[in-house]
């Protein structure tokens, strides 16, 4: 009988170790249930998606206004009797503006906040787009395009800082990928609009003025997006920051990250580890965007040089390349989390260079080969295209984040100004093959630089990625 009771006790009573684990599990679950989450740990909500969507609008406008000028120039040049120098100046003027706008806009955004600049720039872009319709001389168009570039450039650090500071870490690459995809979407829409208006008398006026439409849509969508709580907290406005967190995330979410970043003077960007990061970003972004900007700004001319037709046919060729850029950015959003930032960047640069080398070494190839080579380059531009926005926002603290984005993007635009001005001249002097080889050389330079300097930031909070002892 005693043995039966003992056996029953052994069956019913769990082992001591199992009971301890069960108790420990209960305690852990209670701790997790009562512990507050940080902004990095929450799930994406419809309002957070709205912030990402409308913050990406500035990137859409950049792709739109930059690409549409390539189509518009095919009408503007004969209408105004422009030389290659004037054509190049019109194409490059927006990039000069972007250079000035990214640096000044980033600095002002860190001083007066994301929200105010978020609205001002859209109003200005719409105004100067309208003025472009009424220009009577080439210099007036250069001036209007310059100021459009200033405010498009200012939107880069504003919008991407806002996205980075609102988005949970697991969704940051996808949200920033939306910025890159929006650029390519804007360029693709521009090609479609340009194709539709190409046959109209004074169609170029409608093309340039059409940028007002997305400006109005974005203004409506942005009007209720709040100030960044991280920026507010960095300025000592903790009560306002807490109110924004309660409104957007809920009262159970903590304002400060688990590992808060220290105060970072602006001068810190110009020395030590942050200077190293700044140099990497400036050169990496330059190598990524210079060939792309040249292709978009003078797309119809480049397509014609490859024998893909002229007029509507060349615009269709540019549209096909734009579609490859857009499609390539979609899987890259997810590869940045699954593969990591660094491996995807290295793989992408290698395959981009391969496509450009084919174009440079075999410019007389069959049309199918030309399209596939352009497609290879454009498709794998998706990863670097996202990282040009993601890396600057991850690698610098809140106090100087927008400034860092502005300086990095602005530095890269020095190369795009020279390349965009020089592309029509180089096409005329050298031909399309050597121009593509120069582009391939730039991409290979980006590959080598990234091999030695590109960091891995996957799965880390902004406080961790912006610290100087993470790598």
Language-model segments: residues:
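Transmembrane-helix signature of 12-pass secondary carriers
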Residues: 2-471
């Amino acid at each position: 009988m005693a043995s039966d009771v003992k056996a029953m006790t052994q069956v019913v009573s769990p082992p001591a170790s199992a009971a301890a684990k069960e108790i420990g599990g209960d305690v852990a679950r209670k701790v997790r249930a009562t512990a507050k989450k940080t902004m990095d740990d929450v799930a994406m909500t419809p309002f957070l998606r709205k912030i990402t969507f409308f913050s990406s609008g500035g990137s859409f406008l950049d792709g739109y206004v930059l690409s549409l000028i390539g189509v518009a120039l095919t009408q503007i040049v004969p209408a105004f009797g422009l030389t290659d120098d004037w054509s190049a100046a019109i194409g490059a003027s927006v990039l000069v503006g972007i250079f000035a706008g990214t640096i000044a806009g980033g600095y002002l955004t860190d001083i007066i906040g994301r929200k105010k600049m978020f609205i001002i720039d859209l109003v200005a872009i719409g105004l100067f787009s309208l003025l472009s319709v009424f220009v009577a001389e080439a210099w007036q168009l250069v001036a209007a395009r310059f100021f459009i570039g200033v405010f498009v450039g200012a939107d880069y650090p504003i919008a991407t800082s806002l996205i980075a500071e609102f988005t949970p870490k697991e969704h940051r690459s996808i949200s920033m990928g939306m910025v890159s995809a929006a650029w390519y979407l804007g360029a693709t829409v521009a090609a479609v609009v340009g194709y539709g208006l190409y046959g109209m008398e004074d169609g170029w006026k409608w093309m340039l003025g059409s940028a007002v439409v997305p400006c109005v849509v974005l203004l409506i969508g942005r009007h209720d997006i709040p100030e960044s709580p991280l920026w507010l907290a960095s300025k000592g406005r903790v009560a306002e920051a807490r109110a924004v967190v309660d409104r957007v995330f809920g009262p159970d979410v903590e304002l400060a990250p688990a590992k808060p970043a220290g105060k970072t003077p602006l001068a810190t960007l110009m020395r030590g580890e942050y200077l190293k990061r700044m140099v990497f970003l400036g050169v990496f972004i330059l190598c990524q965007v210079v060939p792309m900007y040249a292709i978009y700004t003078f797309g119809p001319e480049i397509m014609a040089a490859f024998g893909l037709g002229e007029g509507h046919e060349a615009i269709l060729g540019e549209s096909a390349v734009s579609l490859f850029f857009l499609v390539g950015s979609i899987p890259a959003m997810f590869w940045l989390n699954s593969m990591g930032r660094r491996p995807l960047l290295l793989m992408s640069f290698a395959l981009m260079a391969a496509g450009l080398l084919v174009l440079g070494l075999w410019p007389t190839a069959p049309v199918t080969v030309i399209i596939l080579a352009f497609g290879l380059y454009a498709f794998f531009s998706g990863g670097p295209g996202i990282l040009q926005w993601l890396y600057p926002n991850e690698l610098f603290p809140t106090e100087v984040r927008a400034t860092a984005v502005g300086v990095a993007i602005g530095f890269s635009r020095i190369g795009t100004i020279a390349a965009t001005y020089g592309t029509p001249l180089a096409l005329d002097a050298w031909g399309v093959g050597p121009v593509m080889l120069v582009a391939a050389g730039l991409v290979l330079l980006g590959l080598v630089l990234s091999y030695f300097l590109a960091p891995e930031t996957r799965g880390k909070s902004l406080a961790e990625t912006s610290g100087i002892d993470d790598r």
